Amino acid sequence: MNQASTPAMTRPTLSRRFSVAPMMDWTDRHCRFFLRQLSRHTLLYTEMVTTGALLHGDRQRFLRYDECEHPLALQLGGSVPAELAACARLAEEAGYDEVNLNVGCPSDRVQHNMIGACLMGHPALVADCVKAMLDAVEIAVTVKHRIGINGRDSYAELCDFVGQVREAGCRSFTVHARIAILEGLSPKENREVPPLRYEVAAQLKKDFPDLEIVLNGGIKTLEACREHLQTFDGMMLGREAYHNPYLLAAVDSQLFGSEAPPLSRSEALLRLRPYIERHQAEGGAMHHVTRHILGLAQGFPGSRRFRQLLSVDVHKAADPLRVFDQALELLAGR
């Protein structure tokens, strides 16, 4: 299922000390390949894949990745234990390092299929799902969730949820430190309107010291990560990592103690070029890859031109790689 297009490398040990969140339409395999050039140790997540899509759709497309993406987790959306178990087995067979259950997405579309944050109202079902997956595979099974949903947002109810899922065998919880409001707000508003409550997640870590608790929501700097790591076991960044990807270049040294020098922006792009050539040779368009790297150029002369080349000009070019090389020149020495 994987795309062995880069030389085999020793896999780094899976650590959740720092990860990039699963994000629909963003953390596809091209995005993940790019982010991996910047950080060797960051745990990467796929976009959420529903059990129905994996069991009845184009399985190879949903599971495909490049070997360099490890450590790599597949996020699943679903609520039928047997289906989740079958999908977890597919993930393990494809070589994924972890499978994660989405109990945090608030969109109406997934709620109708009993996927995402609405499952926080059904802790026994989530526990059954987790147990089914754990019984099916040897790889890690984790859960990403909110601190509550409207109508079930007390701390006692959060502890009930975590407690039941822990009893099923889950040992790692990624906590988006907001409640999800299941009616009346868009997914975007659900990332902004409910207030961040890091203190609730911190209390959860205090009351469940045996569990690995990873904090997610509103974190924008590695300095903030280091501060929160005094309380939590790991940090997960989402949109900030996507819009400001060069932040990842300092992750290995600042959070994992690596002595390897950080990659420059231009070096990251040079590493991306052969990947783009392979994608084009398979019939793919260059913008499938380059749409994910626009945030690499920020705050210096030529940044705007860089983004224009790769978001506008690339669509009109007879030779898109020439446009890529023009963009690369703008990052020379950076």
Can you annotate each of these PLM segments?
Residues 2-334:
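Flavin-dependent oxidoreductase catalytic cores
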